[in-house]
Amino acid sequence: MPELPEVETTLRGIRPHLQGRILKSVTVREPRLRWPVSEAIYALRDCPVVALRRRAKYLLIELEHGQLLIHLGMSGTLRVVDMDLPLRKHDHVDLLLDSGKVLRFNDPRRFGSVLFQGGDQPHSLLQSLGPEPLSDSFNGQWLFARSRGRKVAVKSFIMDNATVVGVGNIYAQESLFMAGIHPSRAAGRISLARYQALAEAIKRVLAQAIEAGGTTLKDFTRADGQPGYFAQSLNVYGRAGQPCVQCDAILKADRHGQRSTAYCPQCQR
């Protein structure tokens, strides 16, 4: 599933092609995504694109009188292509620009979404979200305060969007390894000092992943069609049964929710 670095990489790839352009029209070939394509999208014509930004894992395209929200789901990608480029399988939505280019949404598994919110009010999906992990408002003090009395595993705690947005399975595992914290440790039993280390690890891991263009394991490609290269830097994710890069102990795996979690039994406590 594309996580925050992949969405941020996509944003940086498409922004130069969309910001300041005119959205001429929208073509929907398959409306049956995670949520049906918003009815209002079909009527969009000649809309100036004011800005593009990201909130959590949502790409937000700001128009003069509303906002498009795009979520990549499990397998979605966005590419900026010539309008006459032949379609590929699973090309579900096209946003035609006045430049003759098209922002094309491809999603084999159809867990993504393309939604519209009119007016100035934020979409309901954007409400009740925690801070952005790369912002100044996210720090160890925030994690420490929110975790008091919580018995949930710290990995599940930092993957909760009410705690902090965009820290998915891959980057939660990598951040906990960098901070030396066992993923199963109860969130409420971690000290302020260790949460400060974890917050810094989350920021560092996400920044490194963005710099590498995200992580391509199966479906994800950047807006230019190229893969992300952070997979070459993974220390624990997908490496259970292999030696730890720091101490050579064999990495183990636990399950949190429906996800397998790799960790080092020596380095993470």
UniProtKB/Swiss-Prot annotation:
DNA binds at residues 90, 109, 150. GO terms for biological process: base-excision repair. Binds 1 zinc ion per subunit. InterPro entries: DNA_glyclase/AP_lyase_DNA-bd (IPR015886), Formamido-pyr_DNA_Glyclase (IPR020629), FPG_cat (IPR012319), MutM-like_N-ter (IPR035937), Ribosomal_uS13-like_H2TH (IPR010979), Znf_DNA_glyclase/AP_lyase (IPR000214), Znf_FPG/IleRS (IPR010663). Keywords: DNA damage, DNA repair, DNA-binding, Glycosidase, Hydrolase, Lyase, Metal-binding, Multifunctional enzyme, Zinc, Zinc-finger. The active site is at residues 2-3, 57, 259. CDD domains: EcFpg-like_N. A zinc finger (FPG-type) spans 235-269. Its cofactor is Zn(2+). Its EC number is 3.2.2.23, 4.2.99.18. GO terms for molecular function: 8-oxo-7,8-dihydroguanine DNA N-glycosylase activity; class I DNA-(apurinic or apyrimidinic site) endonuclease activity; damaged DNA binding; zinc ion binding. It catalyses: Hydrolysis of DNA containing ring-opened 7-methylguanine residues, releasing 2,6-diamino-4-hydroxy-5-(N-methyl)formamidopyrimidine; 2'-deoxyribonucleotide-(2'-deoxyribose 5'-phosphate)-2'-deoxyribonucleotide-DNA = a 3'-end 2'-deoxyribonucleotide-(2,3-dehydro-2,3-deoxyribose 5'-phosphate)-DNA + a 5'-end 5'-phospho-2'-deoxyribonucleoside-DNA + H(+). NCBIfam families: fpg, PRK01103.1. Monomer. HAMAP family: Fapy_DNA_glycosyl. Involved in base excision repair of DNA damaged by oxidation or by mutagenic agents. Acts as a DNA glycosylase that recognizes and removes damaged bases. Has a preference for oxidized purines, such as 7,8-dihydro-8-oxoguanine (8-oxoG). Has AP (apurinic/apyrimidinic) lyase activity and introduces nicks in the DNA strand. Cleaves the DNA backbone by beta-delta elimination to generate a single-strand break at the site of the removed base with both 3'- and 5'-phosphates. Belongs to the FPG family. This is Formamidopyrimidine-DNA glycosylase. It comes from Alcanivorax borkumensis (strain ATCC 700651 / DSM 11573 / NCIMB 13689 / SK2).
